[in-house]
Amino acid sequence: MNRNSFFTYIFCIMTFVFVFAFPSDGAERAAPFRIAAGDGSTLTMEDLSGKIVLCFYETRDTKDKNSALKDELRKFRDQLFEKEKDILYVLPVVDCSGASRLFIGKWKDSLIRESEKAGYTVYGDWDGKMRDDNKFLRNESNFALINKDGSITYLTHGLIEEREISLILRKVRSLMGKEVLF
């Protein structure tokens, strides 16, 4: 390999790594939101500043659709040191905007039960604003990977296939400094 092609090769790799490891200034930012858990505790986008967020936005009917991705991300998270786990925030959100006022108490109880089962606080989007502002699809399983700076690094809807799961895991590892994408 001659000297020029070597430097060209290095330049291409560095450019590729930079493009995928750091969101561009043009990356879409996650819209501000305010969501509430079944126990009444609230969470805003500002509360997640400096964290890598794994956001699952789903309905009661679609919450099991991407269990394979959830399992893989759980395995990855379980391998992390406690300090690293603090950086990676799992954010399950249920679209509660269709809840009738008569049944809000039951919805809140359900969020509490789901939180206990999941090991994470499950939040409700009670007015649908988070869904609409972040371009999540109604009545669908949505996943967003949000970088520490609040930019949406990856957004997808529907059933996430195995190949896409691998890509998401690589992006998460890259954002955490665990893997270089190339």
Protein language model annotation of sequence segments:
Residues R34-I52:
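A short beta-strand-turn-helix
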